[in-house]
Amino acid sequence: MKGLEEYVREILEDIRRRGLEALREYSERFDNYSGPFRVSEGEFEEAEELVPEEDKRVIEETMERLWEYHARQFRDVELYIKRGSLYGLIYRPIGRIGIYVPGGKPLPSTLMMVGIPARIAGVREIAVTTPPKDGKVNPYVLYVAKLLGIEEVYKLGGVGAIAAMAYGVGMRRVDKIFGPGNRFVNEAKRQVFGIVGIDSLAGPSEIAVIADESADKDYVLADLLSQLEHGKDSKAWLLTTSRELADYCSREGIEVLLCRNLEECAEKANEIAPEHLEIITENPEELVDLIENAGAIYLGPYTPVPAADYFLGVNHVLPTGGAARFSGVLTVMDFMKPITLARVSREEFLAYRRLGMRLAEIEGMEAHRRSLEVRR
């Protein structure tokens, strides 16, 4: 029996080699779909009619909140001047991105969370892929795409969608791929990295809650169970100083750690490096400085993960599987490329070139040394 890596590699290579013919075969095999891949203008119009007016208002207000939060992250230049010389960074948006929207449960919020910071960054071209169900794309996903000005939506799922975006099969290839998926999608993203950029390899959802005796036990339990709803591989931890709360939340799927004090709770949280960390204590702000590893920190009883997932305006694309030790939340800057900018004055060049000349000598780079020495 083939392992996941080999199985995905063979599909990717087949699509890269045979192009559309192979892509259509896999679409029929996995999605039972044999029609045109690109969503037509008529399908966008039909989808808009299918979304109730009340839901349209919910989506639009949610998107406004997301836009307000993410717009504050934008920056296009960071410069400083020293001795007449100019140094800094300029930021340029990625030219073309692909967004994978999972199809198991339609996730219009995924498209909002990725599409809005992309637009704020100035990304010019966005292609969306999502698995069709009965030959159609979820109308809520199409409505969000329309609001974002995205005209390219493709009925493609799984490894085939990643191959299409990375190799330019049935569409122009993208520069970077965003969006969560199952283990096949994750493995495909891992294998095409280097040909294109990727955001991250999203795993099962996670929540850790630090809570003390002041926490409402029903709030805490509801929050822990909310993340287990994502699937059987989801993880939930309760880190608490309260024996009563520990006993109340001891349910299947929840790992309870009874700690001596809140400092130990914070220490355990850093070891877990959870995707979401709620702190529901009498003074939650006092623990923030102790937290080093978490995708997001939500303070107090009225900042549950589902609120962040849907309406707070913060981004819910977060590192999982302990990746919060070395990566963080999706931001506008993930859609931009920092480029070094420098213009050095003659005065500063002549004052400091001796440093470069000596380093070039140490490294045996004579032509480098000469490039510095020749200037007068």
Swiss-Prot record:
The active site is at E275 (proton acceptor), H276 (proton acceptor). Its cofactor is Zn(2+). Disulfide bonds: none annotated. Keywords: Amino-acid biosynthesis, Histidine biosynthesis, Metal-binding, NAD, Oxidoreductase, Zinc. GO terms for biological process: L-histidine biosynthetic process. GO terms for cellular component: cytoplasm. Zn(2+) binds at Q227, H230, D309, H368. Signal peptide: none annotated. Substrate binds at S205, Q227, H230, H276, D309, E363, H368. The keyword Acyltransferase does not apply. This is Histidinol dehydrogenase. It comes from Thermococcus kodakarensis (strain ATCC BAA-918 / JCM 12380 / KOD1). The gene is hisD.
